[in-house]
Amino acid sequence: MNAPLGGIWLWLPLLLTWLTPEVSSSWWYMRATGGSSRVMCDNVPGLVSRQRQLCHRHPDVMRAISLGVSEWTAECQHQFRQHRWNCNTLDRDHSLFGRVLLRSSRESAFVYAISSAGVVFAITRACSQGELKSCSCDPKKKGTAKDSKGTFDWGGCSDNIDYGIKFARAFVDAKERKGKDARALMNLHNNRAGRKAVKRFLKQECKCHGVSGSCTLRTCWLAMADFRKTGAYLWRKYNGAIQVVMNQDGTGFTVANKRFKKPTKNDLVYFENSPDYCIRDREAGSLGTAGRVCNLTSRGMDSCEVMCCGRGYDTSRVTRMTKCECKFHWCCAVRCQDCLEALDVHTCKAPKNADWATPT
């Protein structure tokens, strides 16, 4: 009897810290606060001392981060637009996403990664646009260099992504570094995966100089790709996310299923399976799919069968204004008529009990 009891006591601290509810990244709420930087720094709930310190010290960076929140939440919603959970946000909730991210799920892994990536992208872009006092274009990209096409001169303004990554790591990871629990380690891993994703799509752009564009001389610079590429990449990582458990000394992960490979620094990791998101459930933070538009002809996640969780759907006839009878006129315009188009819209039926689900 002693050995099993000893094993239980060994794992009990890890289990208790695993279940901690303090997992929301309160800096996400910076989108909703607005106002001056001082007001923002003092009124965003849940910032740790290091985050408030950086907030007061770098108000211009905070403005860039707060503007970036809308960008990465929009990207999250784009990637999940055909899924039961569609990355919906709650404007009056300081965690931005409500209770749904209290679960250490795939969705949590994606949100932490895309938000960390969004901070890198927003700061780096602000650096290149001359909006920040603490950084500018990448100072290392000077002089002459060589690539597969020959020599070129560094010119223009190379995106200073190393500064963006460094500041994002200091600000975003500050709260997680104060904790030693399993969820903090999960968040740190996914935060890093998000930062690395932005740098993955840094590309070299060049301009040719010479007679008739002969490219005798080239001037090149490094530029971030559109954030959609980062979002699509992290979406693929979400679909291939690896379920993990804590190792015995509580310092890292091991795969939950031994048939799968160990996660790399680029992979997303999670602990818990996701709910089905079919019905409104206050405890799970699920808004359900009642009223969601579904695709009658699709066989994917947006199909009426999958989106509506087998509850069926309602169909309504709606009209919308579209462009029609378009003709090309010389030179150089396309002129169209405005036409009314009737189409059927299918929306998921509500469950028989439309109230908030009561957990049993």
UniProtKB/Swiss-Prot annotation:
Highest taxon in the source lineage: Eukaryota
Residues annotated as transmembrane: none
UniProt keyword Acetylation present: no
Modification note: Palmitoleoylation is required for efficient binding to frizzled receptors. Depalmitoleoylation leads to Wnt signaling pathway inhibition.
Record has Metal-binding as a keyword: no
Cellular compartment(s): Secreted, Extracellular space, Extracellular matrix; Secreted
Gene3D superfamilies the record matches: 3.30.2460.20
Family matches, as SMART domains: WNT1
Entry keyword set: Developmental protein, Disulfide bond, Extracellular matrix, Glycoprotein, Lipoprotein, Secreted, Signal, Wnt signaling pathway
Main location: secreted
Lipid moiety-binding residues (O-palmitoleoyl serine): 212
Residues modified by glycosylation: 295
Molecular-function annotations in GO: cytokine activity; frizzled binding
GO CC term (a single one): extracellular space
Disulfide feature: 76-87, 127-135, 137-157, 206-220, 208-215, 278-309, 294-304, 308-348, 324-339, 326-336, 331-332
Function: Ligand for members of the frizzled family of seven transmembrane receptors. Functions in the canonical Wnt signaling pathway that results in activation of transcription factors of the TCF/LEF family. Functions as a upstream regulator of FGF10 expression. Plays an important role in embryonic lung development. May contribute to embryonic brain development by regulating the proliferation of dopaminergic precursors and neurons.
PANTHER family, sorted: PROTEIN WNT-2 (PTHR12027:SF86), WNT RELATED (PTHR12027)
Record's protein name: Protein Wnt-2
Native organism: Microcebus murinus
